[in-house]
Swiss-Prot record:
The active site is at residue 332. This is Cobyrinate a,c-diamide synthase. PROSITE patterns: GATASE_COBBQ. The record marks 432 as: Increases nucleophilicity of active site Cys. Keywords: ATP-binding, Cobalamin biosynthesis, Glutamine amidotransferase, Ligase, Magnesium, Methanogenesis, Nucleotide-binding. HAMAP family: CobB_CbiA. The a and c carboxylates of cobyrinate and Ni-sirohydrochlorin are activated for nucleophilic attack via formation of a phosphorylated intermediate by ATP. CbiA catalyzes first the amidation of the c-carboxylate, and then that of the a-carboxylate. Pathway: Cofactor biosynthesis; adenosylcobalamin biosynthesis; cob(II)yrinate a,c-diamide from sirohydrochlorin (anaerobic route): step 10/10.
Length: 453
């Protein structure tokens, strides 16, 4: 399987612009399967726009090496891709620890035995770009850095000087350089980039990135590197449990401006277990569709709180669905939506607590949670991994630890100690998780949906 990892020396070097532009440029003549290292939901939305193919996340905190390879294989085979292009996260070696590479781009590159292209912010650099390249190559000899892309060069003269330095002093080929251009930058908000689903200008912007790549990057050289990818180790582990719900169920999934943070394989795990996904909009539709369960992902409900609050028929239908004991699983923004209010505006009110946006990040971490109560997705006395990233908080005014399904071993959750409000058959948590972390997710949730029809 032909592939490449596009990584950077750090955050803010232009990885997403360059990676998405490369995906767009190559998609004109080839089938591209995009991937994103780490738990991010937003960058994959740009990949989807560039390629017309759902991007998949690869994460070594969530996945074993065998699961990383399986997830990569799933993506490549399901889309019949010619090339797999993997956008890294932060700097190449950044992970959860200063001394190992769990959660890093380097861990994904090694699990997939993939060639790597290093993106360098070349502002005011010439020979130092060569030094950076040498340092990144020297830290781990198992990382195969096959090329460099120079971003933010001042001029053609600057590019040629820096290219010569990297190729002669670091013995690494330079595939091209991108000059500074503020017109191609992306809008941002408190959780980072704005999802492509919200940006009306995204199609034109992605097209512009593709043109920029065609004009400045040696795509033939890049494809040659991918064509010569070394074999992937033939050791795979399943992403979800082979146990399969025999009964057919229907599961509602909101997907609109407010809610759009979902991992592709979470939805596939539900479909594997005979669930039919019914997409709907809590903003635009009048009520919940006729379903057996509800899965509310994250997003930006705080940005669209007025629209959500005005849709009273939808709020009432979801509250009644919970009161009727049908299973609901909600993550982060979904948790806020199920609270009494968001910033004082009425919401679903399954949980009688107020949620609000704050000016400071409240939780930004990989998480480890211990399950203390059975719930629609997990059984008591298990432990699972996830992540949290939120500027919001929920003002929990109760005093009973049994209100929660999870106790936090790593991360903040709702109270600093607990997460996963559980009422009726409704579970709502700040934790985002991936089916690789809990292989029985699809089976448990669909089984609960069937048993509580």
């Amino acid at each position: 399987m032909k592939r490449v990892v596009l990584t950077g020396t750090g955050s803010g070097v232009g990885k997403t612009t360059i990676a998405t532009g490369i995906m767009k440029a190559l998609s004109d003549e080839h089938k591209i399967q995009p991937f994103k290292v780490g738990p991010d939901y937003i960058d994959p939305s740009y990949h989807n726009c560039a390629t017309g193919v759902s991007s998949r996340n690869l994460d070594s905190f969530f996945m074993s090496d065998g699961q990383i390879r399986q997830s990569f294989k799933n993506g490549m085979t399901s889309s019949h891709a010619d090339y797999g292009i993997i956008e890294g996260v932060r700097g190449l070696y950044e992970g959860i620890s200063p001394t190992n590479d769990i959660g890093s781009t380097s861990s994904i590159a090694k699990a997939l035995n993939s060639p790597v292209i290093l993106i360098i912010n070349s502002r005011s650099l010439v020979r130092s770009a060569a030094a950076m390249t040498l340092g990144f190559k020297a830290l781990d000899s198992r990382i195969d850095i096959e090329g460099v892309i120079l971003n933010n060069v001042k001029s053609q003269k600057h590019y040629l000087k820096t290219k010569e330095a990297v190729e002669k002093l670091a013995n690494t080929r330079v595939l091209g350089g991108i000059e500074r251009d503020n017109s191609i930058s992306m809008e941002q908000r408190h959780l980072g980039l704005i999802p492509a689903v919200e940006q009306e200008r995204i199609s034109g912007l992605v097209e512009k990135w593709g043109e920029l790549i065609r004009e400045n990057i040696d795509l033939d050289a890049l494809m040659e590197i991918m064509d010569n990818s070394n074999p992937i180790i033939n050791e795979y582990e399943p992403i979800w449990s082979p146990n399969k719900t025999k009964h057919k169920t229907r599961i509602a999934v909101p997907f609109d401006e407010a809610f759009n943070f979902y991992y592709k394989e979470n939805l596939e795990a539900l479909e594997y277990n005979n669930a039919k996904i019914e997409y709907f909009s809590p903003i635009h539709d009048e009520q919940l569709p006729s379903v057996d369960a509800l899965y509310i992902g994250g997003g930006y409900p705080e940005i669209f709180k007025k629209e959500l609050s005005k849709n009273t028929t939808m709020l009432e239908s979801i509250k009644e669905f919970s009161q009727d004991n049908h299973p609901i699983y909600a993550e982060c923004g979904g948790l806020m939506y199920l609270c009494k209010t968001i910033d004082s505006l009425p919401m679903v009110d399954v949980f009688p607590y107020h949620s609000m946006l704050t000016k400071r990040v409240q939780g930004l971490s990989y998480t480890i949670a211990h399950v203390q109560r059975d719930n629609p997705i997990l059984k008591k006395n298990t432990t699972y991994h996830g992540h949290e990233f939120h500027y919001s908080k929920v003002e929990y005014t109760g005093s009973n630890s049994n209100d929660f399904a999870f106790s936090m071993r790593r991360g903040v959750g709702i109270t600093g100690k607990y997460d996963g409000l559980l009422k009726n058959n409704t579970l709502a948590s700040y934790i985002h998780t991936h089916t690789a972390c809990l292989p029985d997710f699809g089976y448990n949730f669909t089984q609960s949906a069937y048993e509580n029809k």
